[in-house]
């Protein structure tokens, strides 16, 4: 088994269960889970230079452009150069993937393919704690008190773009941007696609895939 540092990426539309899969990979294999959404929230909260630039776009209801997200992630990855890591939410576009290429070779890419109806159902049951980014699902990860964050006691919200009428457009945007990224990694032989409606069914295959690349830190598979 290679002793080099593992560089992994997870791709998937909103509601695909990326966060859950990432947590399990981090727990079982000791990879640093680096979420672009989480890092963006941290930078917005602490008013960093890149956070202030991103805020200008978000306040106008615009997507944060590639060059801002890329700068945010490159800065974080520089500090993680001695660690195994797993990227979540980056790269989302071909421009971002090409920027990542300039600093490292990606060893492993997972793409989660979930049927639209499943995504719609999941997201209609999804509630967020805005300041931390904690995600709850009323079916399989409900808060202890309905509508309230477990840790802070602050109210949970449902994002506008999780609502069914916004989801189709959001999914189309994801697919359009992700298609060339998926093709790029497929052409390099590092892409592994998983289809299904249940994270627990996909997980054993993901676990086996990572076990072939890196020694688990748990003697037993953790769920």
UniProtKB/Swiss-Prot annotation:
The stretch of residues making up the signal peptide is none
Question: What Gene3D superfamilies does the entry give?
Answer: P-loop containing nucleotide triphosphate hydrolases
Q: Principal place where this protein is found? A: mitochondrion
Localization terms from the record: Mitochondrion matrix
Q: Which reaction does it catalyse?
A: a ribonucleoside 5'-phosphate + ATP = a ribonucleoside 5'-diphosphate + ADP; AMP + ATP = 2 ADP; GTP + AMP = GDP + ADP; CMP + ATP = CDP + ADP
The segment annotated NMP runs over: 35-64
What EC number(s) does its UniProt record assign? 2.7.4.4, 2.7.4.6
Indicate where the modification N6-succinyllysine is found in the sequence.
Answer: 60, 179, 186
Task: List residues, modification N6-acetyllysine.
Answer: 175, 179, 186
Tissue distribution is: Expressed in the pyramidal cells in the hippocampus.
Q: Which GO terms describe its biological process?
A: ADP biosynthetic process; AMP metabolic process; ATP metabolic process; cellular response to hypoxia; GTP metabolic process; liver development; nucleoside triphosphate biosynthetic process; regulation of oxidative phosphorylation
Query: What PROSITE patterns is this protein classified in?
Result: ADENYLATE_KINASE
Spell out the residue ranges making up region: LID. Answer: 125-162
| Residues noted as binding AMP in the record, renumbered to the chain | 36, 41, 62-64, 89-92, 96, 170
Quaternary context: Monomer. Interacts with SLC25A5/ANT2.
Please give the record's comment on domains: Consists of three domains, a large central CORE domain and two small peripheral domains, NMPbind and LID, which undergo movements during catalysis. The LID domain closes over the site of phosphoryl transfer upon GTP/ATP binding. Assembling and dissambling the active center during each catalytic cycle provides an effective means to prevent GTP/ATP hydrolysis.
Q: Which family does it belong to?
A: Belongs to the adenylate kinase family. AK3 subfamily.
Protein name listed in UniProt: Adenylate kinase 4, mitochondrial
Q: What is the lineage of its organism?
A: Eukaryota, Metazoa, Chordata, Craniata, Vertebrata
């Amino acid at each position: 088994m290679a002793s080099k540092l593992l560089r992994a990426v997870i791709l998937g539309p909103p509601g695909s269960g990326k966060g859950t899969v990432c947590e399990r990979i981090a727990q079982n294999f000791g990879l640093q889970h680096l979420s672009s959404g989480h890092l963006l929230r941290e930078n917005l909260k602490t008013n960093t230079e890149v956070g202030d630039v991103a805020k200008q776009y978000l306040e106008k209801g615009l997507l944060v452009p590639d060059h801002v997200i890329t700068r945010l992630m490159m800065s974080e990855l520089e500090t993680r150069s001695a660690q195994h890591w797993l990227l979540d939410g980056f790269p989302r576009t071909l421009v971002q993937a090409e920027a990542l290429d300039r600093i490292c070779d990606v060893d492993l890419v997972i793409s989660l393919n979930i049927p639209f109806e499943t995504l719609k159902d999941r997201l209609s049951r999804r509630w967020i704690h805005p300041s931390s980014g904690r995600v709850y699902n009323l079916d399989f990860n409900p808060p202890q008190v309905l509508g309230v964050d477990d840790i802070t006691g602050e109210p949970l919200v449902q994002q506008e773009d999780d609502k069914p009428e916004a989801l189709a457009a959001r999914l189309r945007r994801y697919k359009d941007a992700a298609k060339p990224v998926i093709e790029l990694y497929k052409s390099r032989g590092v892409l592994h696609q998983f289809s299904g409606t249940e994270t627990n069914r996909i997980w054993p295959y993901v676990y086996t895939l990572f076990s072939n690349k890196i020694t688990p830190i748990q003697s037993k598979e953790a769920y």
